[in-house]
Amino acid sequence: MAPRSLLLLFSGALALTETWAGSHSLRYFSTAVSRPGRGEPRYIAVEYVDDTQFLRFDSDAAIPRMEPREPWVEQEGPQYWERTTGYAKANAQTDRVALRNLLRRYNQSEAGSHTLQGMNGCDMGPDGRLLRGYHQHAYDGKDYISLNEDLRSWTAADTVAQITQRFYEAEEYAEEFRTYLEGECLELLRRYLENGKETLQRADPPKAHIAHHPISDHEATLRCWALGFYPAEITLTWQRDGEEQTQDTELVETRPAGDGNFQKWAAVVVPSGEEQRYTCHVQHEGLPQPLTLRWEQSPQPTIPIVGIVAGLVVLGAVVTGAVVAAVMWRKKSSDRNRGSYSQAAV
C-alpha cells in the first residue's frame, strides 16, 4: 500500500524555517510479535524526532490508540489523533498478515513466536532538504528488505525477501515512498520541530567527571562519565600522553537517563601511578568547546547512582517493548529513525 498524506491533518500552513541548527530526523519504529495460543500478534509503534519519543501505540492497551509522549504534541486536535490511530491500526493489521506470510514462506512452525520489525523515516539537513530516507524491515532479528540510499531500488536479504522485492517493484512502491520522503515526511518533521522547539532544538551539555576504581596493586580503571546531555550524539575518547587509546578503551552505547537526557561512559585500564598520563576528551554540541579531564586524587563527587539506575530501568522497560529491539537492529542500518503512513505488505 502506498504512503498516505498526513498534511490534511493540519489546518493552516507551517511557516517554513529557512535554516535549522544541524540535521534532524523523523523515525517510525514498529514491532509485531506473534504469540501462538494468545490471540493476534502484539503490535507496538513509536515515533521519534531526533532522540525524543513523542508518539506511542500499543495494540494491547485497554483502548488501543496513538498516545502522546511529549507535551508539545498534546496540542494536536481530535482529527490528528483519530487519523494517526487509524494509521497505526492499519499498519498493525498489515504486519500481522505479513507475519503469517513469512511463516509460510520460511516453512516455519506455527508453534513458535516470531518478530517483524520496521523502521522508516527521513533525515533533514540544515537547509531543510532531504539528506536520506529510510524504509527497512527485519524478520526475527535479521535484515529482510530495505530501500537503498538512491530511494529507487531495494536490497533483499534472501530468496524469500526477493518475493517482497518483486512485489514492491511491480507496485512501483519505491517511487511513491520517495515522494513521501521528499515531501510529507520533511513537512511533518519541520512542523514537529517548530511545535516542540523548546525541547527538540535544545542542546543540554554533559556533566562530566572521572571515577577511579583500583583493580589490583598494579592496575586501576579510569571511567569517564558524561551525564545529563541532549541530544544523544556525543564523543568520548581517552588519550595517553596525547595519543588516542581507541583499541584499549571500553565504550558503552549511549543510553537514556530516564529524564529525557542521556548518559555514557568510556573506560581504560591503566598502570597504578600513571593515571596522570591519561586524559578524557568530551565533545558535544551543547559545549562551547570540548572538555579535557584528568583524574585528580582529591575526593571525587559520588557517581549519581540514582540517575544511572533510572536510566537502566528505562532501558530495561524499553527492551520489553519495541524501541530497543528496533534500535539494536537499526545500528546496522542507520547512523543515528517516519511520519505516519500505511505500510506496504511484506
Curated annotation (Swiss-Prot):
Residues 22-305 are extracellular. SMART domains: IGc1. InterPro entries: Ig-like_dom, Ig-like_dom_sf, Ig-like_fold, Ig/MHC_CS, Ig_C1-set, MHC_class-I_related, MHC_I-like_Ag-recog, MHC_I-like_Ag-recog_sf. It is found in: Membrane. Residues 1-21 form the signal peptide. The keyword Transmembrane helix applies. Residues 112-203 are annotated as: Alpha-2. One of its GO terms (biological process) is immune response. Disulfide bonds join C122-C185, C224-C280. The chain crosses the membrane at residues 306-329. It is a single-pass type I membrane protein. Residues 204-295 are annotated as: Alpha-3. Residues 330-346 are cytoplasmic. GO terms for molecular function: peptide antigen binding; signaling receptor binding. Its main location: membrane. Residues 22-111 are annotated as: Alpha-1. Residues 296-305 are annotated as: Connecting peptide. The keyword Membrane applies. Heterodimer of an alpha chain and a beta chain (beta-2-microglobulin). PANTHER family: HLA CLASS I HISTOCOMPATIBILITY ANTIGEN, ALPHA CHAIN F, MHC CLASS I-RELATED. Belongs to the MHC class I family. Involved in the presentation of foreign antigens to the immune system. This is Patr class I histocompatibility antigen, CH28 alpha chain. It comes from Pan troglodytes.
